[in-house]
Amino acid sequence: MAGKVTVAFFMFAMIAFLANFGYVECNPAIATGYDPMEICIENCAQCKKMLGAWFEGPLCAESCIKFKGKLIPECEDFASIAPFLNKL
């Protein structure tokens, strides 16, 4: 008797899992919403921490405000941070 209940429960769980398999999305940025300007300024701060005196953080933050967060800098992408680097 217990074996039949276990098998029935297992089958129900598998059917429920397979029925919902294609509908699950795990993207917290979309689920909670995000502000591109906030991400832009946070990335400027992160790049400043990583690159120190070689990175012009205030200039980066000003560009975030000027372009309303449309040009988000990526610290590991030279093309996106090139305008904010100085030669020392």
From Swiss-Prot:
Q: Which InterPro entries does the record associate with it?
A: Eclosion
Q: What does the similarity note say?
A: Belongs to the insect eclosion hormone family.
Alphabetized UniProt keyword annotations: Disulfide bond, Hormone, Neuropeptide, Secreted, Signal
Where does the record place a coiled coil?
A: none
What does the record give as the organism's lineage? Answer: Eukaryota, Metazoa, Ecdysozoa, Arthropoda, Hexapoda
Q: From which domain of life does this come?
A: Eukaryota
- Listed GO biological process terms: ecdysis, chitin-based cuticle; neuropeptide signaling pathway
Which N-terminal stretch is annotated as signal sequence?
1-26
Cysteine disulfide links: C40-C64, C44-C60, C47-C75
- GO CC annotations on file: extracellular region
For this UniProt entry, the molecular function terms from Gene Ontology, in alphabetical order, are:
ecdysis-triggering hormone activity
**What name does the UniProt record give this protein?**
Eclosion hormone
**What subcellular compartments does it reside in?**
Secreted
What role does it play? Neuropeptide that triggers the performance of ecdysis behaviors at the end of a molt. It triggers adult behavior patterns: larval, pupal and adult ecdysis, and plasticization during the molt.
Q: What is its main location?
A: secreted
